[in-house]
Amino acid sequence: MDSIKNLIVTLGENAKNAAKTLRCATTVAKNNTLINIASQIDQNRASIFKANNQDLVNGKNKGLETTLLDRLMLDEERLNGVIESLNQIINLPDPIGEITDLKYQPSGIQVGKMRVPLGVLGIIYESRPNVTIDAAALCLKSGNSVILRGGSEAIHSNYALYTCVRQGIKQAGLNENCAQLINTQNHEAVIELVKASDYVDAIIPRGGKGLVEAISNSAKTPVIKHLNGICHTYIDKDADKKKAISIAFNAKTRRYGVCNATETLLVHACAVSRILPKLIAQYLTKGVELRGCKETLKLSNKIIAATEKDWNTEYLDAILSIRIVNSMSEAIKHIDKHGSGHTESIVSENYTRSRRFITEVDSASVMINASTGFADGFEYGLGAEIGISTDKFHVRGPVGLEGLTSQKFIVLGDGHIRQ
């Protein structure tokens, strides 16, 4: 226990010292670091895949679910995506040092705000090894030092990627402790990290609801959290048939194990006969298990009766709940009761109802005629994201560069004194 505590103290002290220099680093230096990291990843593909394969074999031997193994897997396409997200972050404007709202006051002074890093961030995540790069890159570009703690199931993949990060930082001449990895499977390290308020300014957990709630309940530092993604797609009575089928099918089946996948499909009763039978057939052909309300059950004997628990479940699997509603008000009421505040989408050609939907639905992302799968920092032009916050404070929705910053007041005078 003492050795783990000492480890976190050492990492915390290193991170805090590194943050002092990183917040003053130039945009060129930070971008060069990311360029170097991308180059290191490209040059070390073989060792990264070897490490990832070791994690996949261990995961299969331990009986990890298919969706978890999918999150864990790295292939050429996904590694190319990691490099592309680095390039996108490089091309994003550097928010640090930006001065806004600079105004003269009656006293003659000018008062404005300057964007600054949060300081030291602790990122705790499960399964997805690409988070090692996404988190490090966003923290470095936004001037924050970071302590990373990945899931034990991805320990070899995370270390292989972290080695690329460390080498990229070193090549750019920045403090190597700008990014550090807790390379132990001991859970005490997580407990100590979230309590390290003397060193860590904020904790960002990425993982299942159980992990996020446990960290939120025990942390002594602010937590930017993403609890879960019970996302809804609502097909309105005036929905275009082709759009509705395409959007609803993609929102569920593009990838099952992601937080922006639709888990519940709501369909207006007036749209059922022309849209739902074909959509149900497509889902069943794809192998999606369907659970429906009483009215939905009448459409196919292959649909299972939905329970109250289903409406509150983030499946992260090839399972979809379907409910037929008699009005948009009923759909919104369902979302308010069962949603997690992540992402909801309406499919409709009616402008007034679409506007009403995005106004009344209280979620981090609300869409019109688009798949919930677009709820992603990369798709929003933020570069990679550290997570999708379902909180309303300090940041909401995909957490990109600006979400990892704060503002301080600056005052400009010319010998002004207060009377």
Curated annotation (Swiss-Prot):
Its main location: cytoplasm. Keywords: Amino-acid biosynthesis, Cytoplasm, NADP, Oxidoreductase, Proline biosynthesis. Pathway: Amino-acid biosynthesis; L-proline biosynthesis; L-glutamate 5-semialdehyde from L-glutamate: step 2/2. GO terms for cellular component: cytoplasm. Pfam families: Aldedh (PF00171). One of its GO terms (biological process) is L-proline biosynthetic process. GO terms for molecular function: glutamate-5-semialdehyde dehydrogenase activity; NADP binding. It is found in: Cytoplasm. SUPFAM superfamilies: ALDH-like (SSF53720). The keyword NADP applies. Its EC number is 1.2.1.41. It catalyses: L-glutamate 5-semialdehyde + phosphate + NADP(+) = L-glutamyl 5-phosphate + NADPH + H(+). Catalyzes the NADPH-dependent reduction of L-glutamate 5-phosphate into L-glutamate 5-semialdehyde and phosphate. The product spontaneously undergoes cyclization to form 1-pyrroline-5-carboxylate. Belongs to the gamma-glutamyl phosphate reductase family. This is Gamma-glutamyl phosphate reductase.
